[in-house]
Amino acid sequence: PHRINIIGWSSVGELFLSVDNELIKASESNNWRMTYVKKLPFDDIEMLNMNPQGTQFVFRRGDKHIWLYDIQEDSHYQVTTSKVDGITDARTYYSGGERLPSFSPDGKYIAFTGQPRHSAVPYAYDPAVFGTAAVVNMLIIIENNGKTRDLDADNDGTIFYPKDGKYPISAEQRLIWR
């Protein structure tokens, strides 16, 4: 069996898919015939999401971090880094890495979920706020600017807080940004 992932729709109506580690596209104008685009540089990708412009997609690799692939440039880079191995205390590390990336409608930002360090989000493990779960995924938003973000760095500005600024946003499902 093949591993098939739906990546998303381009602005011109092309549906992009990955079949194992090959990038495929289909469109109504081509009678929905699958067309090979190129071989992807990784075989451990999941949670793929395409930007609205149809030029880039973000995904999670087996290393539990977010990566970006530029289709036109045929290039890729690691978007996030954090400690995911050797977990001894859920309040210290991003135990599950980063998940479920999604682009803003203009492609300038990437939103995803992650499990922030206790020191970065002081209320993240307050049972009165988030219940008794050991780990809480938070909404994280970063610029799509070609840089790798170290999510273990203090005050890196990636955790999204609502206007009242008291508690971060808990996010457990795929993000859809319209």
PLM regions: where:
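Sequence signature of WD/YWTD-type beta-propeller architectures
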Residues: P1-R178
